[in-house]
From Swiss-Prot:
This is tRNA uridine 5-carboxymethylaminomethyl modification enzyme MnmG. Signal peptide: none annotated. The lineage of its organism: Bacteria, Pseudomonadati, Thermodesulfobacteriota, Desulfobulbia, Desulfobulbales. It comes from Desulfotalea psychrophila (strain LSv54 / DSM 12343). NAD(+) binds at residues 283-297. InterPro entries: FAD/NAD-bd_sf, GIDA_C_N, MnmG, MnmG-rel, MnmG-rel_CS, MnmG_C, MnmG_C_subdom, MnmG_C_subdom_sf. SUPFAM superfamilies: FAD/NAD(P)-binding domain. Keywords: Cytoplasm, FAD, Flavoprotein, NAD, tRNA processing. The gene is mnmG.
Length: 647
């Protein structure tokens, strides 16, 4: 019997407004934002079981990263709610320092986090999930009109968001062995990587790494220092206030490497793919491998290691501080030289991964590419590292892709509004040659961009764009009213300088009160806080009001607003000067080569980056004050700026 063979037909799926490629932290936020804003969205993922997967450490937040999580939440994103529902430890960091640099970090149950995010995705209206691998785009008249897949699907779309993480030409290294993978256990995306190369995008190569996972049953915790959760644990999401935690809170444990550990690493360094010259990608400066730390800092006799549980129902432990790509046998020997890990068994080896990224200088502040106006990039493909940085970009890409389809101006948060604005402005203005990590030190106005006031800064924007529901917006308004009332209360209550008052102040190493003063005036003293004010001899009604404020959810923000009033006003004045520069828009088609007074280097940088404002131009590396003055003069000629305006 003979059979007639027919070529397989191209499968035509339904048309979609937006396709999101990749379902990590960037892809999930992008897809949810697009769908919640009313657009028919397709989430294309190579394996639906990895939606929301935490590929590296089982934690959300940290220094500056906690700020991002709160900002994502204030705008209507999902990450904060998911970590609140799946957290097994919560800690406030930098509490001995100023409010600008205090941040939150939560350990997650890795499995529950992924399943919770997957459930949110699956139940979201307007959002379709498809297990498929996109390998290219259909481009007509300079715009994307569809995507193709490895199984010959052809899907019509009006905009696309690429959030592929480490999957573009991913290559895993363990010792001198390497193999293609997007992460250990998952294949890479090669077809889509080829598409970016073939279509003239500036593609670079980066590298990151992760730690070996070890069996908790083989760890001796008896002599290790426990690090307990803050109790009661706090929350990231403003939705979670007062709801309480349902999961048990687990401790982490602290141990250290030692000279024996370092000697084992030095002996095996010739088998490190990084030091053998096999890895070409640039690694993360602020998350170096343990072998890199040993070789670069030989004077250090030990390095801290945090043993972090990966969940309630698993024995896997994440030894934070030990990312490595050394051979498995060296990893075992290294681990077993560390106190508490003498009998440790590795469940999953540590490894390094190289991957393609797209130069973010090719992006607009909306995260749309300059080459194709309806193609958006978010996450590690833009050269960043970290779940939180990825999620923030995904949220903004999702918002702006919908606004593009609605022919509305993109939402661009500036550096004075949010850490999200700092992150994106750094990427599109300065670019990056190594995995970018956000720090509070990158923000010029960090006292205004505190973690505790993310809702004050961004909830109204979230409501205006349509992501923040009315219930949450009303809670935000109630909180703002409570802050205002708290400040007014401390302004209204005054106290006289009596012997008892001065004794109480002296006990706190505070100077005598010389004249009748409002409690808000006393609160501006560095050694005084709202809790201390309860000790003062107040009337029954005033004491009750102070106690209520000290125990309220707005206590911290009231305290910061009063205690740092002068500094906040100063930063607000700086912001006004900054905003004047940002409002001076540069024409998109400006021919910089025709402007006299600009060097060839300046012309090249301005022509490449195409800054949207005089402010952005001034932040480009190598753009001198003289060059900014040339641009300012040109804007005057174009009637963009009156000659007597001051900057």
């Amino acid at each position: 019997m003979t059979y007639e063979i027919h070529p397989l037909p191209i499968i035509l799926m339904s048309d979609f407004d937006i396709v999101v490629i990749g379902a990590g932290h960037a892809g999930c936020e992008a897809a949810l934002a697009a769908a919640r804003l009313g657009h028919k969205t397709l989430l294309a993922v190579m394996n639906v079981d990895t939606i929301g997967a935490m590929s590296c450490n089982p934690a959300i937040g940290g220094l500056a990263k906690g700020h991002l999580v709160r900002e994502i939440d204030a705008l209507g994103g999902e990450m904060a709610r998911v970590i609140d529902a799946t957290s097994i430890q919560f800690r406030r960091l930098n509490t001995s320092k100023g409010p600008a640099v205090q941040s939150s970090r939560a350990q997650a149950d890795r499995l529950l986090y992924r399943l919770q995010m997957k459930s949110v995705i699956e139940h979201q209206e307007n959002l379709t999930v498809s297990q498929t691998e996109v390998n290219g785009f259909i481009v007509e008249d300079g715009k994307i009109t569809g995507v193709t897949t490895t199984i010959d699907e052809k899907i019509s779309v009006k905009a696309a968001i690429v959030a592929t993480g480490t999957f573009l030409n991913g290559l895993v290294h363990i010792g001198l062995k390497n193999f293609p993978a997007g992460r250990l256990g998952d294949g890479p995306s090669t077809g889509l990587a080829d598409w970016f190369y073939d279509n003239g995008f500036a593609v670079g190569r980066m590298k990151t790494g992760t730690v070996p996972r070890i069996d908790s049953l083989t760890i001796d915790y008896s002599e290790l220092e426990a690090q307990e959760s803050d109790m009661p644990p706090a929350h990231f999401s403003f939705d979670s206030q007062g709801k309480g935690y349902t999961l048990p809170q687990l401790p982490c444990y602290i141990t250290y490497t030692n000279e024996k550990t370092h000697e084992i690493i030095r002996k095996g360094i010739d088998q490190s793919p990084l030091y053998a010259g096999i890895i070409q990608g640039i690694g993360a400066r602020y998350c170096p491998s343990i072998e890199d730390k040993i070789m670069r800092f030989p004077e250090k006799d030990r390095h801290q290691v945090f043993l972090e549980p990966e969940g309630l129902d698993t024995v896997e432990v994440y030894p934070n501080g030990l990312p490595t790509s050394l051979p498995l046998e060296v990893q075992i020997e290294m681990l077993q030289s560390i106190k508490g890990l003498e009998n440790a068994r590795i469940i999953r080896p540590g490894y390094a991964i190289e991957y393609d990224y797209i130069d973010p200088l090719g992006l607009r502040p909306s995260l749309a590419t300059k080459k194709i106006e309806n193609l958006y990039l978010a996450g590690q493909i833009n050269g960043t590292s970290g779940y939180e940085e990825a999620a923030a970009q995904g949220l903004m890409a999702g918002i702006n892709a919908t606004r593009y389809l609605e022919e509305r101006e993109p939402l661009i948060l500036d550096r004075s509004q949010a850490y999200i604005g700092v992150l994106i402005d750094d990427l599109v203005t300065c670019g990056t040659k190594e995995p970018y990590r956000l720090f509070t030190s990158r923000a010029e106005y960090r006292l205004l961009l505190r973690e505790d006031n993310a809702d004050s800064r961004l909830c109204q924007i979230g409501k205006d764009i349509g992501l923040l529901d009315e219930d949450k917006h009303q809670r935000y308004l109630i909180k703002q009213a409570a802050i205002d009332a708290g400040c007014a209360t401390l302004d209204a209550i005054s106290i006289k300088p009596t012997a008892e008052v001065n004794r109480i102040l002296n006990d706190a190493a505070s100077a005598d009160l010389k004249q009748k003063s409002a409690l808000s005036s006393l609160l501006r003293r560095p050694e005084i806080n709202i809790t201390f004010l309860q000790k003062l001899p107040l009337t029954a009604g005033d004491k009750e009001a102070v106690i209520a404020l000290a125990n309220s959810a707005v206590c911290q923000e009231v305290q910061v607003r009063i205690k740092f009033k002068g500094y906040l006003q100063r930063q607000e004045e700086q912001v006004q000067r900054f905003k004047r520069m940002e409002t001076l828009k540069l024409p998109e088609d400006l021919n910089y080569a025709q402007l006299s007074g600009l060097s060839n280097e300046v012309v090249e940088k301005l022509s490449t980056i195409r800054p949207i404002s005089l402010g952005q131009a001034s932040r480009i590396s190598g753009i001198t004050p003289a060059a900014v003055s040339v641009l300012q003069v040109h804007l005057r000629k174009l009637n963009y700026l009156k000659s007597n305006d001051k900057i």
